[in-house]
């Protein structure tokens, strides 16, 4: 009887351990300096204001090489690049969520990054206007680029290989369609947003089709998520446009982070 109880306890123990056996520490993906700053502040951000296109915060993720394949084409324009790296405690997500489970998995994160409709009505702080504004008046998946019929979020099951199309009515850029591609394994989810339409600010066409990317990689690190957000776009070399564009895109990254941590 005692042997049977010991065997059961061992099975339970190894079962629990196996849930985290593939989850690596976030320290395996970043250097000591970045790890220390993440531990202290929870975020590390770099805005590239020169001609360098090197992504200095991109962790050594499995999908990092895939991200590098999905960057905007280098052109004779001003290129804006923003990198943000977040260390997120899963317990903080659970406190704000409707989940009844005792942890958050990569499957949960996969569902969230495909819950595009939950972006609708989300707000951001406009650095230019110095006020809170609605970022997306509309945000939903569509059945195709041709018919553009609204459909429910396709956010169940494994996301690997999924291609979706999205329509968003953006406070800064107006109505725009995006192509979304997803890649997923047992520990990570990677999503890349690519604009299908040109994007404008007022009377100016600021961003050409396929000239904007929003890259999102989430990796499970046991009791934490390591979240990497990168935005980049080409735009005219006009100081006024550049300033407004940078303010808008930085605020957008902050809004995407809030969407990720609050949509469970």
For the regions a language model picked out, list residue spans one by one.
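A mature extracytoplasmic/lumenal domain signature
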Residues: 169, 184, 193-197, 222, ...
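Hydrophobic ligand-binding cavity/cleft-lining segments
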Residues: 25-171
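Bacterial N-terminal signal peptides
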Residues: 9-18
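Hydrophobic/aromatic beta-strand elements that line small-molecule binding cavities or substrate pockets
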Residues: 177-184, 213-219
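Sec/Tat signal peptide C-region and signal peptidase I cleavage site
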Residues: 19-23
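A conserved amphipathic terminal alpha-helix motif
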Residues: 236, 241-264
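Bacterial N-terminal signal peptides that target proteins for export
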Residues: 1-9
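Beta-strand/loop substructures that line and gate deep hydrophobic ligand-binding cavities in soluble
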Residues: 200-242
């Amino acid at each position: 009887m005692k042997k049977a109880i010991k065997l059961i306890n061992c099975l339970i123990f190894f079962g629990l351990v196996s849930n985290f056996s593939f989850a690596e520490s976030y320290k395996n993906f970043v250097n000591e300096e970045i790890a220390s700053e993440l531990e202290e502040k929870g975020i590390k951000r770099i805005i590239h204001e020169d001609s360098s296109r090197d992504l200095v915060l991109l962790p050594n993720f499995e999908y990092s090489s895939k991200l590098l394949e999905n960057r905007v084409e280098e052109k004779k324009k001003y290129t804006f690049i923003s990198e943000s790296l977040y260390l997120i405690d899963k317990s903080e997500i659970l406190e704000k969520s409707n989940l009844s489970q005792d942890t958050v998995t990569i499957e949960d994160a996969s569902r969230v990054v495909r819950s595009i409709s939950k972006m609708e009505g989300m707000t951001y702080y406009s650095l230019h206007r110095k006020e809170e504004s609605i970022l997306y008046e509309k945000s939903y998946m569509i059945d195709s680029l041709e018919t553009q019929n609204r459909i429910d979020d396709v956010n169940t099951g494994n996301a690997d290989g999924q291609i979706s199309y999205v329509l968003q009515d953006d406070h800064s850029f107006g109505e725009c369609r995006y192509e979304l591609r997803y890649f997923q394994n047992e520990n990570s989810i990677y999503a890349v947003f690519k604009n299908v339409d040109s994007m404008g600010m007022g009377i100016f066409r600021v961003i050409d089709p396929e000239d904007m990317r929003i890259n999102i990689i989430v990796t499970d690190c046991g009791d934490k998520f390591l979240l990497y957000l990168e935005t980049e776009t080409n735009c005219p070399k006009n100081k006024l446009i550049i300033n407004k564009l940078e303010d808008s895109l930085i605020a957008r990254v902050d809004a995407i982070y809030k969407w990720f941590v609050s949509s469970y």
